[in-house]
UniProtKB/Swiss-Prot annotation:
The active site is at H62 (tele-phosphohistidine intermediate), H299 (pros-phosphohistidine intermediate). This is Multiphosphoryl transfer protein. The keyword Isomerase does not apply. The phosphoenolpyruvate-dependent sugar phosphotransferase system (sugar PTS), a major carbohydrate active transport system, catalyzes the phosphorylation of incoming sugar substrates concomitantly with their translocation across the cell membrane. The enzyme II FruAB PTS system is involved in fructose transport. SUPFAM superfamilies: HPr-like, Phoshotransferase/anion transport protein. It comes from the Bacteria. GO terms for biological process: phosphoenolpyruvate-dependent sugar phosphotransferase system.
Length: 376
């Protein structure tokens, strides 16, 4: 985990334009002993190649591979510009994080930062923060409320089971491992009978022991009988705030529209999408899967190429890292795409809904095959 010092954070700065802002940041990196004087040329050259604007008012200026020899030690300098700095194409940066890193050390840092900054509320707080301490707490995720835990780690699919107790125990264990519940919750949800929602779907929860909002799902390989009723899938909810309500609403919509059977046959990524994305409930969604071959995965430059390809089309497009959390992200947001933590060899599933969905998926596949600007 990268550690950020308050000495590396500069609140309330001003710059007339992007170049001036980058020169200020480069000077701070040099002053801190992170880079030699020539690194600024690489930072400016990088902007000519691809804008380092991530979205949500955040930019991450950094050098090119040609100036890696100018890096003395890995580090960052964070500049806050409350009045904003135009970063091109109508984009305004309020926080610029200058990165100095040799080899590929910056990729882990970038993924860490984008995971925090992809939260829209955090980005807004970064604009209005007034002290280095407050900015540091936001960037390190110390002030970030915990997001709903519902991903591959809280799902157990294709379980050999002939009773609900097996599914109850699996879900309780998953939630306990995630730090979402305590022993009282585990005991309650294992001992009490779940509620039958119909169509093979069952639900349980507990008023006690909720430490963090999370949802666990377990599914039997084959449906079984519980007192004359079909049982195949159990959803267990830990509720510490209102976040699980949206999941329960989507579950309710599936049941009302007699589409809950999708949950019984879907793979992990599709099941997550059904419970977390409204688009997944429609019938006119197309999907395609591609493998990322870029040596360093989807960092800022190939990520930008991917997002720019997606923005050429009108369809709503989401992307899911099948080898990551499995949760879908908005394909038009560079911040959210980079936060997926895509590495070489990871499988991405794209879903598209709209009049040009088929063309969009083909263009995405072609762009990935061509190396997203880094060569095939």
């Amino acid at each position: 985990m990268f550690q950020l010092s308050v000495q590396d954070i500069h609140p309330g700065e001003q710059a007339g334009n992007k170049e001036e802002a980058i020169r200020q940041i480069a000077a701070a990196l040099a002053q801190a002993g992170n880079v030699a004087g020539g690194y600024v040329d690489g930072m400016l050259a990088r902007e000519q190649q691809t804008s380092t604007f991530l979205g949500n008012g955040i930019a991450i200026p950094h050098g090119t591979t040609d100036t890696r020899d100018q890096v003395l030690k890995t580090g960052v300098q964070v500049f806050q510009f409350p009045q904003g700095v135009t970063w091109g194409e109508g984009q305004v940066a309020y926080v610029a994080i200058g990165i100095a890193a040799s080899s590929d050390e910056h990729l882990g840092l970038l993924r860490q930062l984008t995971h925090v900054l992809s939260d829209d509320s955090v980005a807004e707080q970064l604009k209005s923060a007034t002290t280095a301490e407050e900015l540091r707490a936001l960037l390190m995720g110390e002030k970030q409320s915990e997001q709903l835990k519902l991903d591959n780690e809280t799902m157990t699919l294709d379980v050999i089971a002939s009773s609900l107790v097996t599914l109850q125990a699996l879900n309780a264990a998953r939630l306990k491992e995630a730090g979402a519940v305590d022993a009282a919750f585990v005991a309650k949800t294992i001992n009490d009978s779940p509620m039958n929602l119909g169509q093979g779907i069952w639900l349980n929860d507990s008023a006690e022991g909720n430490l963090r909002s999370a949802v666990a799902v377990s599914r039997a390989t084959q449906a079984f009988d519980v007192e004359g009723e079909k049982a195949a899938l159990l959803v267990t909810v830990a509720m510490n705030d209102e976040q699980p309500i949206a999941v329960l609403k989507r579950l309710g919509d599936l049941l009302l529209n007699n589409k809950a059977d999708r949950l019984l046959s879907a793979d992990a990524a599709t099941l997550l999408a059904l419970l977390t994305s409204d688009d997944a409930l429609t019938d006119d969604v197309l999907s395609a899967e591609f493998v990322v071959r870029n040596e360093h995965g989807l960092h800022a430059r190939p990520g930008t190429m991917l997002v720019n390809t997606i923005k050429q089309f009108n369809s709503e497009i989401t992307v899911t890292n099948l080898d990551g959390t499995g949760k879908p992200a908005n394909g038009r947001s560079l911040m959210k795409v980079v936060a997926l933590g895509v590495k070489k060899g990871h499988r991405l599933r794209f879903t598209a809904q709209g009049e040009d969905a088929e063309q969009a998926l083909k263009a995405i596949g072609d762009a990935i095959a061509a190396g997203l600007g880094e060569g095939a």
